[in-house]
């Protein structure tokens, strides 16, 4: 971190909205946050207690639910504070560093994890007989660990490039969280090189992951079309549809914010809601409502709890 920074705290402007909407927005985002945490905790619990879900697909889903739960926790509580009172908009310099790091750490790890999950679906559908041996427990653990380590490295680059610059004057961040683009606008130095490296870094991660996901699904579609039974094709498509929905809801807003020329603070703040608030909620909804195995496990857990309480 830069030793020449004079700024000790930043002010988050919060989500762009009319002043009279503070209370309604606070209520809405609080409900969404609680549902996000409870929904992802439910998925973690269901997969943990149901032995039928101890498969590679659900192993990666537990990682995704864990990430989403904390990804939402890194961003939403502070956003709620900005809606409660003006003092809630203040964030210390070091807290801002921490939020930026964990925001990119969890976000990029999720990006890498989506890529691994698409590869897992490709192997399951294209090589059903060899799938178990190809996705062994050790390989699953290696792939999951790689996503976390890659996310950590990516986040370290973003954080160092952002806060290595001096901040000696303006301290108002035009966002509801500490993110690199709005923070760099406050630096008391030339940021062109930093912005270029950050742009290339995010571009390589986002475009690389998305390209691999697209290639996986092109191969999956080709494999599905070779399935002779309509029931088999329907089940394969249903399995992949959930993943496709979540991937699109995550990648499209990210690409819009980080990889388009120019930046509009108001538009970026609104679009960021999709992947910081809605996507973590969408994951448990999509994977429970569209997944028969998860729904069956949830009902089984409910019956088990009801039976234990009735005794």
Swiss-Prot record:
One GO term in the molecular function aspect is: olfactory receptor activity
The cysteines covalently paired via disulfide bonds are: 96-188
Report any Pfam family annotated for this entry.
Answer: 7tm_4
Tell me which PROSITE patterns the record gives: G_PROTEIN_RECEP_F1_2
As for membrane topology, the entry says: Multi-pass membrane protein
Give residue spans on the Extracellular membrane side: 1-23, 74-98, 160-196, 258-268
Please list every transmembrane segment annotated in the UniProt record, as residue ranges. 24-44, 53-73, 99-119, 139-159, 197-216, 237-257, 269-289
Tell me the SUPFAM superfamilies matching this sequence.
Answer: Family A G protein-coupled receptor-like (SSF81321)
What GO biological process term is on the record, naming one? detection of chemical stimulus involved in sensory perception of smell
Q: What keywords tag this UniProt record?
A: Cell membrane, Disulfide bond, G-protein coupled receptor, Membrane, Olfaction, Receptor, Sensory transduction, Transducer, Transmembrane, Transmembrane helix
Specify whether Ribosomal protein is a keyword of the entry: no
GO CC list: plasma membrane
Write down the InterPro entries for this protein, in alphabetical order.
GPCR_Rhodpsn, GPCR_Rhodpsn_7TM, Olfact_rcpt
Parts of the chain on the Cytoplasmic side: 45-52, 120-138, 217-236, 290-311
Q: Where in the cell is it found?
A: Cell membrane
- Give the protein's biological function: Odorant receptor.
| UniProt record similarity statement | Belongs to the G-protein coupled receptor 1 family.
Indicate what this protein is called per its UniProt record: Olfactory receptor 10G9
Give the gene name. Answer: OR10G9
